[in-house]
C-alpha cells in the first residue's frame, strides 16, 4: 500500500469545559454518557491537495472517500462503530480473568481508594490550601475508582462471564476435534484456569499492597523519583537539577498531616487483609509500640 504523510494538522474546535466535563465525577465511567469530551482536528494540504509543510496558504484537505454524518438519528439495527485506537484492551479476557476482576481487582480498588478519598475529602473541606494541593490527586484516584464500579456493573448487567463461558465451551469443542500432536489447543483453557487459580492469592496480596501503599501513601514517592533518576545501583546521578525540580513539584502539593492520616489507615487495612506481610511490617512491629508511633 502507499502512504502519504500530511504534517499540517490543526486544532480547529473544542467544546467548552461545561460540555467537556458535563456530569463531572458522578457520570464518570457510567453509560450512557452525555459528555462532549472531544476535540476536532483538520488536515491541511497544499492547493493541489498534496502534502505540504505548514503555510498560511494551505487549504483543508479534500478526501476522495469519506463518511457522511447523518443528522437524521438512528434506528435499531443500524451499523455502529467506535472511532479511535485503544492503547490496550481487555476484550479477550477469559471467564477466569473476568471472575478475578469481579471478586478481587475491582472490589479491592473500590474499597481501598474509597477509604483514602474519604480522608482526602475531609482535609480538603477543612483547608483551602489542601483543597488546591489535592484536587488533582483526588480526581486521579477517583477516576479508576469510578471505573471499577462502572466496569463491574456493566459486566454483571451484560452477563459477560456467562457469555465468555459459552465462547470457551465452543472453543473447547473445536479444539478437541482439531488439535494435533504438538498443538494441544484443547489443553489451553485448562492451563489458563489452573494458572489463574494458583496465583489468585498472591495476586490479591500484590494488588492490595500496590493500591494501599504504592498508590496511596505519598511519602514513598520521592524515593521512587530518586530510584528512577539513578537507575542501576551505584550509577551516578546524571541530572541532579532535574531531580530537584521534580522533588520541588512534589513537595509543593504535599501535606504531611494528610498523608500521615492516609498512611495510618492504609497500614491498618494491609495488616487486616494481607496474610503474608512484607518484612518491613515485621520489623516495624518489633521497633514501635503501636501503629501511631510507626507512622
Language model features with spans:
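Terminal presequence/propeptide segments associated with secretion/organelle targeting
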Residues: 1-295
Amino acid at each position: 500500500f502507499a502512504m502519504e504523510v500530511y504534517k499540517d494538522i490543526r486544532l480547529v474546535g473544542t467544546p467548552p469545559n461545561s460540555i467537556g466535563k458535563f456530569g463531572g465525577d458522578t457520570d464518570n465511567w457510567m453509560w450512557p454518557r452525555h459528555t462532549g469530551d472531544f476535540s476536532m482536528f483538520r488536515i491541511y494540504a497544499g492547493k493541489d491537495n498534496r502534502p505540504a509543510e505548514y503555510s498560511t496558504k494551505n487549504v483543508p484537505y479534500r478526501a476522495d472517500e469519506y463518511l457522511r454524518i447523518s443528522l437524521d438519528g438512528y434506528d435499531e439495527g443500524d451499523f455502529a462503530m467506535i472511532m479511535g485506537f485503544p492503547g490496550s484492551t481487555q476484550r479477550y479476557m477469559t471467564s477466569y480473568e473476568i471472575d478475578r476482576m469481579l471478586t478481587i481487582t475491582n472490589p479491592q480498588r473500590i474499597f481501598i481508594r474509597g477509604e483514602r478519598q474519604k480522608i482526602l475529602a475531609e482535609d480538603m473541606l477543612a483547608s483551602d490550601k489542601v483543597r488546591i494541593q489535592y484536587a488533582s490527586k483526588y480526581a486521579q484516584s477517583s477516576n479508576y475508582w469510578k471505573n471499577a464500579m462502572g466496569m463491574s456493573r456493566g459486566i454483571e448487567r451484560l452477563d459477560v462471564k456467562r457469555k465468555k463461558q459459552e465462547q470457551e465451551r465452543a472453543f473447547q469443542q473445536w479444539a478437541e476435534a482439531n488439535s494435533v500432536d504438538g498443538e494441544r489447543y484443547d489443553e489451553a483453557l485448562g492451563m489458563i484456569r489452573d494458572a489463574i487459580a494458583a496465583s489468585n492469592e498472591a495476586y490479591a496480596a500484590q494488588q492490595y499492597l500496590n493500591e494501599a501503599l504504592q498508590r496511596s501513601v505519598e511519602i514513598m514517592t520521592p524515593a521512587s523519583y530518586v530510584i528512577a533518576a539513578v537507575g542501576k545501583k551505584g550509577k551516578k546521578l546524571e541530572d541532579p537539577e532535574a531531580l530537584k525540580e521534580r522533588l520541588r513539584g512534589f513537595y509543593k502539593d504535599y501535606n504531611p498531616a494528610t498523608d500521615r492520616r492516609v498512611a495510618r489507615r492504609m497500614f491498618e487495612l494491609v495488616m487486616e487483609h494481607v496474610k503474608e506481610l512484607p518484612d518491613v511490617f515485621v520489623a516495624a512491629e518489633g521497633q514501635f509500640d503501636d501503629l501511631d508511633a510507626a507512622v
